């Protein structure tokens, strides 16, 4: 839900765009899905520089209809609601949401998530942890996690196969700083 969108053209298409260094996620997805689509470069102008991203476009109406049922719709960032998932998939969804629209502080146990209020509630309920909401403005939620930080990281990353490596490394650096290693 974080870095992908469904677009209505002549038919529905699903597009996901990631930093070039994270393209391995797209490759793993295609391999597991046994997809024949290709990953292409997308050049984006950023601060007077051309930045190359990797983009996957899937033109499959049934696939797109299933995503729409789960809330992946145009302009979803403004209206996103939690998907209807079995409990065994919630942590994977939340990890993907945080990988795409979240930030893990390198200096303290803080997570920042840019999302709707309904999705934020969903995440906080899944964590069931001692969390203080610091700020919620313009769909940006900052929250500190104190004593349950380690348990939340285990919940998100234990036996996980898909994640953004650079985000995981950032989290593990914080854990190491606090004397907790996985």
Residue ranges and their predicted role:
Residues 1-182:
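Internal intein/HINT superfamily modules and their associated LAGLIDADG
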């Amino acid at each position: 839900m974080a870095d992908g969108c469904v677009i209505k053209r002549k038919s529905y298409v699903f597009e996901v765009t990631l930093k070039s260094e994270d393209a391995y996620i797209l490759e793993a997805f295609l391999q597991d899905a046994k997809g024949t689509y290709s990953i292409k470069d997308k050049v984006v102008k950023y601060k007077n520089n051309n930045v190359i991203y990797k983009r996957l476009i899937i033109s499959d109406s049934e696939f797109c209809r299933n995503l729409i049922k789960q809330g992946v719709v145009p302009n979803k960032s403004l209206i996103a609601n939690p998907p209807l998932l079995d409990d065994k998939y919630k942590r994977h969804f939340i990890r993907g949401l945080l990988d795409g629209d979240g930030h893990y502080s390198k200096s303290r146990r803080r997570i920042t998530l840019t999302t709707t209020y309904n999705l934020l509630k969903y995440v906080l309920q899944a964590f069931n942890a001692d969390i203080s909401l610091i700020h919620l403005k313009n769909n940006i939620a900052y929250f500190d996690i104190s004593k349950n930080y380690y348990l939340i990281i285990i919940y998100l990353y234990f036996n996980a196969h898909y994640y953004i490596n650079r985000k995981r490394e950032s989290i593990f650096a914080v854990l190491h700083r606090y004397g907790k290693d996985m």
